[in-house]
Amino acid sequence: MIHFADLGAISLANSNTVIAGCIVFALYYLFQFLNSKKLNFDAPVIGDASDLRSALINGYNQCPNTPFLLPTAAHPTIILPIKYIDEIKSLPPDKISFLEEFRDRYFGHYTAFANNTEGDAVTTSVKVDLTQSIARALENMQAETELAFATELPKPKDWMSVTLYPIILRMVAKVSGRVMVGEPLCRNEKWIQISTTYTRDTFLGGRAVWARHPLFRPIYALYSPELKKVRQHYTDAAEFLRPIFNQRFKEMERDDFEKPQDMIQWMIDNSGNNAKDATFQGRCQLLISFAALHTTSGLLGNAMLDLAARPKYIEALREEIAANLPENTQITKQILTKLRKMDSFLKESQRMNPLNLVTMNRKMMDTVQLSDGTILPKGSFLGMAAGSIGFDPRIFENPDEFDGFRFEKLRQQEGAENKFQLVTTGKDSLAFGHGTHSCPGRFFASNEIKTMLIELLRNYDFQLLPGTERPKNLKSDMSLVVDPTAQIQIKERCR
């Protein structure tokens, strides 16, 4: 029998344990804070955090061959000139890390964002399995695209104004989801809500933590309303995926089981001991959503706005589609490869509207001396001014002019047949990064966007609102985003 005195002793012991734990917790982060050092790197700081695009343009022009510091919110970022690209992409992971930069930028140790095991499983599944299976996935992508347009984008007889980005985001979520989680989950309203808002909530959660003094961030993170939303997304994603994975494991026990070529199976194969962990699988799917949905929607949204602002390109792209893809024909990878004008238009739209102003983002895991003596300190963050490269007159002729078929014409040069494509990376094209950690999903995204653009051009007329110019993109830290309130007019295509 337990007496009240015993309960008091237990309560006191528990209180002492909690107090001791809090002291250890506070001392640990005090030690971390006191041992943090300012970046020891001799380079000019260009601009301020309120307008990073202008800072990058000015820094790129003022320091064409030397590094400069960009005053990004969480920590300064070393912006390296393009001459270092081969050295940077060749550094081993014990010296430099893409994933650690990614995690730090979004305060992953508080948001549980992109842990190493999750990042590895997702990267392998997307870079290897998904890329090799795009041809097989196109049938499902086309079917879901047709259904998404039918349910999300009206087809009125007369001009109708619509707010573009939210519609595109939902359609991309459905089409991507058809490949990532299958049907019917890809059309589940709660799943669409989770996958489309996770990115925003992770960003806001990281920002909210950053706004606090470093000593109080761990405590704030425990009670942050922003991070509570992120944790709820993880819980909800796990609940949705648990029965799907359990069913797959039951099927795998059958003697006649044949592995489906889908993301569920690839994640099982690439997750090691975490294969049956629904929470892990939920985090992985949300990481895919983070990397894919808004970037794909941004590229497609910008292309639609550019087409609406420059209607002369619409008919040219329709003619190219008609010449290579008869009505009621299954889209194939080979057919999409033939749409060179569409590919060029998308790449030019991407050049003029860079979603990521800085790419090749890395964190130095060790101090490295480059070939010219430049020292990159351990713990520093670096990147390259991808958005500014696209406007460099030394690289592109008349860079401030929109030429939708710029890259199609460049591909007509001898030996350039397979260069200058949307998915191509290199010193003059860093939108998707470059090297080992270039965007692994860019091949899938390219095919997805083209499939959706075909559906749009075949069945809709669209234009800017009368008397308006192309809506400007909005600045957001090191990104440019499509204005979520931007509107266009649409109607059923007149044939």
Curated annotation (Swiss-Prot):
Cellular component annotations (GO), alphabetically ordered: membrane
Glycosylation sites noted in the Swiss-Prot or TrEMBL record: 115
Pathway: Polyketide biosynthesis
S-S bonds: none
GO molecular function terms attached to this record: heme binding; iron ion binding; monooxygenase activity; oxidoreductase activity, acting on paired donors, with incorporation or reduction of molecular oxygen
Record-stated family: Belongs to the cytochrome P450 family.
Function of the protein: Cytochrome P450 monooxygenase; part of the gene cluster A that mediates the biosynthesis of botcinic acid and its botcinin derivatives, acetate-derived polyketides that contribute to virulence when combined with the sesquiterpene botrydial. Botcinic acid and its derivatives have been shown to induce chlorosis and necrosis during host plant infection, but also have antifungal activities. Two polyketide synthases, BOA6 and BOA9, are involved in the biosynthesis of botcinins.
Protein name: Cytochrome P450 monooxygenase BOA4
Source organism per UniProt: Botryotinia fuckeliana (strain B05.10)
Gene for this chain: BOA4
